[in-house]
A protein has these predicted regions:
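Substrate-binding surface in catalytic domains of secreted glycosidases
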Residues: 1-70
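Substrate-binding cleft of secreted/luminal carbohydrate-active enzymes
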Residues: 44, 50-52, 57-146
Length: 146
């Protein structure tokens, strides 16, 4: 094997209702890199370019949702940044969404990706140089266009 890929996504727990963003967290990556892990081969680095909704019921994980439209104010009410209370029972992506459920919207924020990229550059060997954006499609790419 000539090189590896350090996947810098899904860094947090989808199961913990206190998690702010399980896709990418600077604090999670920082703690991992502090452990001084070595791989013995050059690494490329993969960063997330996607978002999802984490469906919680009574504080317990139920599902990952990929296509949630929170603009429907009859179904959803934002209770805090990125957290939406379900107001109406409905089905979404073959999941029964119940009134009172909470959906946590998690995104790959450009500034967080850049912070993590700078952290990785300061901690890892200089022979590691390639950047990979994971799950890149036209919808996800549009969030990174200026």
């Amino acid at each position: 094997m000539d090189k590896g890929v350090l996947m810098l996504y899904n860094t947090g727990s989808i199961y913990n209702p206190e998690t702010e963003n399980s896709i990418l967290s600077y604090k999670d990556v920082q703690a991992y890199l502090k452990s001084k892990v070595t791989y013995g081969l050059p690494l490329d680095f993969a960063y997330p370019a996607y978002s999802w909704g984490i469906l919680m019921e009574n504080g317990n994980f139920r599902a990952i949702l990929h296509e949630v439209d929170f603009s429907n104010t009859l179904r959803y009410k934002e209770t805090s940044e990125g957290n939406y209370l379900v107001l109406q029972e409905h089905y979404l992506e073959n999941h029964h969404i119940r009134k009172g459920n909470v959906i946590r919207l998690e995104t790959s924020k450009f500034n967080e990706i850049m912070r993590v990229k700078q952290l990785v550059a300061s901690q890892m060997k200089p022979d590691s140089c390639h950047t990979i954006l994971y799950h890149l499609d036209s919808l996800n790419l549009s969030t990174f266009e200026e």
